[in-house]
Amino acid sequence: MKKYLLVLLIFISCGGSDSPVETTDTTILETTTLGEIMEKTYTEQHQMTIDDNKNYTAVIKTSLGDMTVEFFTKDAPITVNNFITLAKDGYYDGVIFHRVISDFMIQGGDPSGTGHGDYGKYPGYEFQDELNNQIPYSKGILAMANRGPNTNGSQFFIMHVDYPLPYNYTIFGKVIEGIDIIDVIASVETGAGDKPVEDVVIVTVEISES
């Protein structure tokens, strides 16, 4: 069973309210639980297989509807190649959006679906940031979670609303169709750790190129 974890430390609840309150910690961390050996890990970073002269899109099919993402291949070729390679390998199939915060973002890419654990290097490698401060973190933006500089792996988040995050997270795409599905996912009931009470599942991710 694959074991991953993504911990978001940007918001806390206070005063008995479910509304988020910003703290001084504005980091989105990728962490990993220790447990069963992963069914699918890699010994090294994937080789570049995409053509930066082509246009790539992904249809992220979820249990609540589909979202089509257009990738920023020229801005973040390494990150796009990583996501596409993992998606084609079925890495995201059956993974849930394990952390959902309305009016902020939805997080996925953590096959364990948990919210606690030790830092780790999964899916078996980490790769460098491709930061671009010319692209705002606006609604529909797709970006990588990390646990510090140059620690990207498989986990990602999609912005529910425009938000002035620090430019610490590689932006590598944007939802161009099905943006209403972000609203649907962001509106689900959540429990401890901002995890949806009922699983929101990534059924599969279909990649196209032109």
Give each language-model segment a name.
Residues C14-S210:
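Cyclophilin-like peptidyl-prolyl cis-trans isomerases
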Residues Y4-I12:
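Sec-dependent N-terminal signal peptides
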